[in-house]
Amino acid sequence: MRVDGGGFKVDRKYDVPVRAGWPAVLRSQTRVLDPLVPIELGAAFADGLMPASVNVRMTVSALPPIPFASALKGALEYPYGCAEQTTSKGYAALELDDSTAKLLGVPGLDAKKRRERMEGAFGRLASMQVSSGHFSMWGDDSYISPGLTPYIVEFLLDAKEAGFAVPDNVLQKALARLSEDLLAGGAQFYGSDKREHLKFANQAYAGYVLSRVNRAPLGTLRALYDNERGNSLTGLPLVHLGIALSQQGDKNRGRRSIDQG
C-alpha cells in the first residue's frame, strides 16, 4: 500500500496469509539405517492429507536429526509479526542464503527477496522501538519486554556484519539502553517465576551483545560472575557471560564461566 501526497510518502507491505480451514499436520520419523535393509518413504505416510499440499523431505546424515530446514521454513512462513516474531523471521531470511539453502536441501531466497525481507524486518522493528530504546511487542507502549531487546540487537548486529543496511539510529538507541540497564542492575522481572535466574540471564545476554561492540563494562561483568552466577539455572547465560568476559579482556573468568555453562 502506498500513500503519496501533501509532502508525505508512506509505503507499507502487508502479508495476507491464505490457507486451508484445517491446521497443518506434521509427521516425522527418525530411523537408524541398516546397510542391508532398503529404506523407503511409502505413500501411506500421506494418508488422510490433501495431496497437493503435502511437502515431503527425507534426509540422510551422520549428524543428529535437528530440523533446521523445517524451522527456517516455518519461521519464514509464520503469518504474525510481534517484535519477537519479526526478529525470528528476519533471522530466517538472514541465515537462508544460497549456500545454506543448498546445505539444507531447501529452496532459498534470491538476493532481491532476501533483501526485501530484511528491510521489512528493519522497518517494522524501527516502528516498534519506544523512547527508552526497548521495543514494544506489538508497536505501541502497551507491552514492553526488556528481555527481548538483547535478542533484537543481536539480530541487528548480525545483519550489519552480513552487509545489510541496518538503521543505525535504531541500533545505537538500543545499545545505549542495554548499556544503561546493565550498569543500573537490569530489568527486575518482578512477579515472574525464577525471577533471579531471569534477571541474571538478561544481564548476561546484554553483556554478551554489548561486548560484540566493545561496550560491556568489565567491572560489571566481573561482579555478575563473582556474585550472581549461582542464580543461573541453565548453562546458556553462563556461556553468554563467559564470552562477554573474554571479549572484554578477562579470559580467566571467561573460560571458567563457559566451562561452568
Over which residues does each language-model region extend?
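Extended, solvent-exposed functional surface patches
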Residues: 1-197, 203-225, 240, 244
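Solenoid-like repeat scaffolds
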Residues: 223-234, 261
